[in-house]
Amino acid sequence: MSEISAQLVKKLRDLTDVGMMDCKKALVEVAGDLQKAIDFLREKGLSKAAKKADRIASEGVVALEVAPDFKSAVMVEINSETDFVAKNEGFKELVKKTLETIKVHNAHTREELLKSSLDNKPFEEYLHSQIAVIGENILVRKIANSKAPSSHIINGYAHSNARVGVLITMKYNNEKNAPKAVELARNIAMHAAAMKPQVLDCKDFSLDFVKKETLVLIAEIEKDNEEAKRLGKPLKNIPTFGSRIELSDEVLAHQKKVFEDELKEQGKPEKIWDKIVLGKMERFIADNTLIDQRLTLLGQFYVMDDKKTIAQVIADYSKELNDTLEITEYVRFELGEGIEKKAENFAEEVALQMK
């Protein structure tokens, strides 16, 4: 076999982005055949990537791209092991190519993305090659691919720290109001990025979830009331319910009668009941929908006007525009949400803090 030239090693390095020594070893292994050396390194890279895939990837980025006409958008969460790698130019290029691949192949799931192609090879193979080159486990964890039907727009917001992204799809009736819908969707996406609503509406909750969360909520309020009582401050009302989905017509009718009976017993004139009962019912609903106010986008109070819920803000816009605006889809990604670090990593962090 002829000696492996420096030019050939450099060419292989340029083609594969693998270190010079590994390139030379690969060329020696395959007797200087460039294509076989590329295949050899790919196989070697895949082997390394498989080992790296056992590591926990909880850093990375959330990135999104909204089409200029606001009729489509894609969003992705890509995890790496360290924040340092997430700032690497190679990693940024991977994120860019991932978003483009989702658009080109119209992928709607992670599985569809991995089976699609990029640069004439499977995307999954491309991802493994990047794991080998970058040197960390990299995971495409979530993707979103939204298309706006007629009379809908999509807008979004990605936080500057690249850790949170939100997409909002909004419906309108009059095409002239599309720009206003775009503006409102952007503002609501910014709200959602900050306030972390879990779902769009209380209808997305299961009854079991609401009942469990209500018990937790009551325990919190009772604890707060103990402290308030000690300090001589007003006590909070203890709710019976947690969400609007529990407030059936029967429940509301019963509560209204309770208030009317109280007014009758107090000797209040019947002609003023309606106004008093209306206020009491509004307070009852507010006190018994606290889970909605915490966890639903429509039920949360707007960060730019904390006197109004998001639902009320949308209603006000609709009235102003003489239209009916409605959020039809809400997607929020937060980097590493639900990923737990290994116990030993946490123990090491605690130990370091105690030194």
UniProtKB/Swiss-Prot annotation:
What the protein does? Associates with the EF-Tu.GDP complex and induces the exchange of GDP to GTP. It remains bound to the aminoacyl-tRNA.EF-Tu.GTP complex up to the GTP hydrolysis stage on the ribosome.
Question: Where is this protein chiefly located?
Answer: cytoplasm
Q: Which InterPro entries match?
A: EF-Ts_dimer_sf, Transl_elong_EFTs/EF1B, Transl_elong_EFTs/EF1B_dimer, Transl_elong_Ts_CS, UBA-like_sf
Please report a single Pfam family linked to this protein: EF_TS
User: What is this protein called in UniProt?
Assistant: Elongation factor Ts
UniProt keyword Amino-acid biosynthesis present:
no
What family does this chain come from, according to its entry?
Belongs to the EF-Ts family.
Keywords of the record: Cytoplasm, Elongation factor, Protein biosynthesis
Under Gene Ontology molecular function, one entry of this record is: translation elongation factor activity
Residues of the region (Involved in Mg(2+) ion dislocation from EF-Tu) are 82-85
NCBIfam families assigned: tsf
